[in-house]
């Protein structure tokens, strides 16, 4: 099956993180953003003009590096097929690996998750990644209003992130036992204070959610809390009329602070099953239900077991945490073409590259070299594609995702059949 969108987004985020850490020796790193539908011949013409102007650069080393980067990008553009539905983003430049003389040309070609809108050419000491940040933002937002007689919490749920925007307290006094006119007057004052508190909640909600609604990113409003206060707030005209149209439902809750938002999400899970947070939670809970069975059920976990079962085609859904730091390295013999694939911790990759230079082939004692390095999630995604398995990359921001990361080294799976 086709690669899961969570894998695509993970790889995009990983590339962004790597690019943000790259630095050139001088002003010689090139960033090119090609808008969707733009003719590649126009882009190539612009780059050739930049190539010509680069001859004016005073430093010969910088001039040479800039020209090399532009030429690499021109070559990559020739390999692309039009039309580009989303456009393309290309980065190229000489990146130092250590001291002077260790620079190596690096090139990155990214297909953006959303269409590129504006052409950008930038030559700097670092790659221009600011526009990439917009692509990794979740576009759909749920507004949350938790309310009771004494306090309220206004927040958002965006992808996997819960954000508390405002906490309010009413100052409304509690019930009393006194009777007579004084009691009735006090009761009116309390009712008026409660009404004014609702008005404040409505004003802060409008201030918080209308900008999101105007950007067409507000998917809906969830209103919760103990007692009847939430229903009164939802039914009367405390909210802006456009926001009232976005109310999905009201929910009975025990809490009105951040824990109440989590309680609300649990109760609203059927309505929000498309939300990443709930999809991940439900999937991981399904895995744990299999795991706790006496025979382990249809569960697998850990790098060794998961890799073996995936290659057998026995995995239905592979769960990988986004913090897994492994690279799939293929080393090959210079003499007999013997190959070996190894998972290497990404932080140890440079050390492993040095070790390979002294490695001896097991079959003919020839020298070995690195043929390919690939992010482990990209590699696993390709295997899943071959074996018609699903792959889901989960965040460690959730309790369930953190459990997979810590207890199972970031890899778990639900099997198709018992092994």
UniProtKB/Swiss-Prot annotation:
Keywords: Cytoplasm, Protein biosynthesis
UniProt record similarity statement: Belongs to the eukaryotic release factor 1 family.
NCBIfam families attached to this UniProt entry: aRF1_eRF1
Primary location recorded for the protein, binned into one broad class: cytoplasm
Organism: Methanococcus vannielii (strain ATCC 35089 / DSM 1224 / JCM 13029 / OCM 148 / SB)
GO function terms (MF aspect): translation release factor activity, codon specific
Gene this protein is translated from: prf1
Domain of life from the UniProt record: Archaea
Protein name in the entry: Peptide chain release factor subunit 1
Keyword Protein biosynthesis: yes
A GO CC annotation given for this chain: cytoplasm
Subunit note: Heterodimer of two subunits, one of which binds GTP.
Protein's job: Directs the termination of nascent peptide synthesis (translation) in response to the termination codons UAA, UAG and UGA.
Subcellular location: Cytoplasm
InterPro entries cross-referenced by the UniProt entry: eFR1_2_sf (IPR042226), eRF1_1_Pelota (IPR005140), eRF1_1_sf (IPR024049), eRF1_2 (IPR005141), eRF1_3 (IPR005142), Peptide_chain-rel_aRF1 (IPR020918), Peptide_chain-rel_eRF1/aRF1 (IPR004403), Ribosomal_eL30-like_sf (IPR029064)
Cystine residue pairs: none
Keyword Transcription regulation among UniProt keywords: no
């Amino acid at each position: 099956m086709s690669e899961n969108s969570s894998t695509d987004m993970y790889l995009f985020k990983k590339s962004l993180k790597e690019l943000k850490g790259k630095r050139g020796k001088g002003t010689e790193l090139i960033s090119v953003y090609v808008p969707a539908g733009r003719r590649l011949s126009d882009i190539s013409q612009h780059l050739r003009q930049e190539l010509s102007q680069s001859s004016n650069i005073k430093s010969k080393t910088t001039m040479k590096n800039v020209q090399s980067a532009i030429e690499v990008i021109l070559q990559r553009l020739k390999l692309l097929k039009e039309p580009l539905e989303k456009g393309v983003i290309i980065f190229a430049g000489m990146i130092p690996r250590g001291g002077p003389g260790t620079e190596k040309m690096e090139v990155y070609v990214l297909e953006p998750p959303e269409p590129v809108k504006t052409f950008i050419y930038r030559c700097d000491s670092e790659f221009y990644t600011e526009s990439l940040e917009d692509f990794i933002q979740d576009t759909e937002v749920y507004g949350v209003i938790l309310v009771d007689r004494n306090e309220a919490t206004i927040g958002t749920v965006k992808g996997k992130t819960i954000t508390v925007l405002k906490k309010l307290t009413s100052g409304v006094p509690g019930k009393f036992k006194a009777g007579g006119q004084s009691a009735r007057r006090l009761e009116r004052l309390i009712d008026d204070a409660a009404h004014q508190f609702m008005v404040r909640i409505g004003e802060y909600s409008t201030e918080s959610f209308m900008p999101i609604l105007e950007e067409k990113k507000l998917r809906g409003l969830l209103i919760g809390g103990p007692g009847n206060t939430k229903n009164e707030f939802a039914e009367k005209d405390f909210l802006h009329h456009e926001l009232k149209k976005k109310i999905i439902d009201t929910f009975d809750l025990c809490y009105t602070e951040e824990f109440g938002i989590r309680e609300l999400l649990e109760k609203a899970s059927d309505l929000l099953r498309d939300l990443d947070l709930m999809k991940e939670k439900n999937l991981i809970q399904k895995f744990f239900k299999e795991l706790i069975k006496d025979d382990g059920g249809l569960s697998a976990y850990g790098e060794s077991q998961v890799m073996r079962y995936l290659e057998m085609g026995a995995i239905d859904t592979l769960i990988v945490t986004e913090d897994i730091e492994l690279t799939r390295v293929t080393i090959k013999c210079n003499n007999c073409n013997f190959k070996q694939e190894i998972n290497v911790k990404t932080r140890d990759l440079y050390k492993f590259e040095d070790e390979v230079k002294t490695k001896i082939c097991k079959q003919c004692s020839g020298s070995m070299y690195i043929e390919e390095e690939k992010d482990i999630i990209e590699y696993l995604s390709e295997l899943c594609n071959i074996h018609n398995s699903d792959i889901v990359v989960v965040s460690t921001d959730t309790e369930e995702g953190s459990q997979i990361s810590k207890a199972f080294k970031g890899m778990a799976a639900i099997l198709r059949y018992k092994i």
